Amino acid sequence: MVETNKNLPAWRKAIAAAAREVHKGEPIDEPLITRLDFYLPKPKKPRWLVPATALDIDKLERAVNDGLQDGGLIKNDSRVVQSISEKHYAEERTGCQVTVFRHGATAVHIDFQPR
């Protein structure tokens, strides 16, 4: 699949690097739930209170899930059985907060800001 947003591959690589930093063990190989909060640049005059604009949330989710797999946090992105995602305007830094929950158990948290 070809990415239509030129920044998503860089996000994916950065998320993979962040995943490697926080998770040193074997990839998680069980059903997972993700909580993804995307913090996007706020325009000078936003049309809406939230960023209902260009970056599609499903493409952002895919980039994160692929990055989590590439970074060895999860065995396969097909293990994500539920995802709760929101786009917000960034007050300070842009990026993504990622929390991965084992279905019915504990969580792994990643606070990712692109450099």
Model regions and ranges:
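Acidic, proline/glycine-enriched N-terminal capping motif
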Residues: 1-115
